[in-house]
Swiss-Prot record:
GO process annotations (BP): ribosome biogenesis
GO molecular function, one term: magnesium ion binding
One Gene Ontology CC term in the entry: cytoplasm
Species the sequence originates in: Acholeplasma laidlawii (strain PG-8A)
CDD domains, per the entry: Obg (cd01898)
UniProt protein name: GTPase Obg
OBG-type G domain span: 160-325
Biological function: An essential GTPase which binds GTP, GDP and possibly (p)ppGpp with moderate affinity, with high nucleotide exchange rates and a fairly low GTP hydrolysis rate. Plays a role in control of the cell cycle, stress response, ribosome biogenesis and in those bacteria that undergo differentiation, in morphogenesis control.
Disulphide bridges, residue numbers: none
InterPro entries: G_OBG, GTP-bd, GTP-bd_Obg/CgtA, GTP-bd_prot_GTP1/OBG_C_sf, GTP1_OBG_dom, GTP1_OBG_dom_sf, OBG_GTPase, OCT_dom
Length: 419
């Protein structure tokens, strides 16, 4: 069995758009051929796709750099470059993705569902696209936009209908093997289950997924034991099967402490539906403890079983199936499409004076224009200068005290300011 990995950070790098082409028609008997450079193709996107056959993020742990291909450059004779193929990465159901600013990109909940993680850059326009009445033969083109590059935080919350809840060594692993097709490791010591075990349970025409989660202990909400690793997986379970061992010194105290940990982790979990199970009814003195436990819980239904002896298992399975029919599945989390730049967050340009006396220009809009410019093409550089004036950069530089002969740096490009 592969190791269980439920959190990983990966670098995603979508493809850059292909460059536009500078070309002209040069054919016999065509006196004024005009521009004929095609546009570049779009860079490849990066998608995650849900795969019900996966239950861990271990593939991402050993592949922390995910890249998509670049778009094809435009060609002569008006030929546009092909879009790059998109990159698809298979992930388990329950995968949640955040960008490097902690914005939620989305989550993968269904088999075959695709989630856009990083968007490929637009292809640059060829010189054919810039022809106008004022410039019938443009001799410049755009370079393709960069694809998105960032560190993505990927988490897995086990996607199960039912989560087994309880102290270590209450018999959860034995129970899941009795009610489902799961093959859990079983031993008589704490924390036998170090990672979630999933099993499919069939009850007549119904079927549901149950998860045996790592045992919970007191102060788990503070990260003690496997606390936080466990608790985040509880969030996605529609029903919690709260198992209390009747060979405990104080079953009621165990029950109350586990519920307290849930509430301290997330107040909303106090309203999560629970089915309370009294396990190990085969041990000596269990019946007396069960009666006292049931009396203390008053109106809460308690189902007595012995997972070891296979007693009460069918009754429990029917109870779970009946309860699940009354509880809807979770709606997806609200997402923030990180690749959509909010108007209030976009900055055309920022001017700072560096320690070396050089005036530095940065900004969102400026970055896009800069990357689209071919600085080996004089006409493209002149167009970039016109775009800077259009943004008001020339006036802003003078307001910041820039004078004739000063050096101005725009990202990796330096030029001398001339009045």
């Amino acid at each position: 069995m592969s190791a269980f990995v439920d959190a990983v950070t990966v670098e995603v790098k979508a493809g850059r758009g292909g460059n536009g082409k500078v070309a002209f028609r040069r054919e016999a008997h065509v006196e004024f051929g005009g521009p004929a450079g095609g546009n570049g193709g779009r860079g490849g996107h990066i998608y995650f796709i849900g795969d019900e056959g996966k239950n861990t993020l271990i593939d991402l742990k050993y592949n922390r750099h995910i890249k998509a291909a670049n778009g094809v450059h435009g060609g002569p004779k008006g030929m546009h470059g092909a879009h790059a193929e998109d990159t698809y990465v298979r992930v388990p159901l329950g995968t949640i993705v955040y960008d490097d600013k902690e914005n939620l990109i989305g989550e993968v909940l269904e088999h075959g569902q695709t989630l856009l993680i990083a968007q490929g850059g637009k292809g640059g326009r060829g010189n054919m696209a810039f022809a106008s009445n004022n410039n019938k033969a443009p001799d410049f083109a755009e370079q393709g936009d960069l694809g998105q590059i960032f560190l993505a935080k990927v988490e897995l919350q086990v996607l199960a209908d039912v989560g087994l809840l309880g102290y270590p060594n209450v018999g959860k692993s034995t129970l899941i093997t009795r009610i489902s097709n799961a093959k859990a490791k079983i031993a008589d010591y704490q924390f036998t289950t170090l990672s979630p075990q999933l099993g499919m349970v069939n009850v007549e025409d119904d079927a549901f997924v149950v998860a045996d989660l790592p045992g919970l202990i007191e102060f788990a909400h503070l990260g003690v034991g496997l606390g936080l690793q466990f608790l985040k997986h509880v969030e996605r379970c529609r029903v919690l099967l709260h198992i209390v061992s009747m060979d405990s010194l104080d079953p009621l105290d165990d029950y109350n402490k586990i519920n307290n940990e849930l509430v301290l982790y997330d107040e909303k979990l106090k309203d999560r539906t629970q089915i309370v199970v009294a396990n190990k009814m085969d041990v000596e003195g269990a019946q007396e403890k069960f009666e006292a436990f049931k009396k203390a819980l008053k109106d809460v239904k308690v189902i007595p079983i012995s997972a070891l002896m296979n007693d009460g298992i069918q009754t429990l399975k029917y109870e779970i199936a009946t309860t699940l029919k009354t509880i809807p599945k979770f709606a997806p989390k609200d997402t923030t499409k990180h690749y959509t730049l909010n108007a209030e967050d976009a900055v055309d340009f920022i001017i700072n004076k560096g320690d070396d006396g050089v005036f530095e220009l940065t900004g969102d809009k400026l970055f896009v224009l800069f990357n689209r410019t071919d600085f080996n093409n004089e006409s493209a550089v002149k167009r970039f200068a016109r775009q800077l004036r259009g943004l008001g950069i020339e006036d802003a530089l003078r307001e910041h005290g820039v004078v004739h002969g000063d050096i101005v740096r725009i990202f990796s490009y330096e030029f001398e300011y001339l009045e």
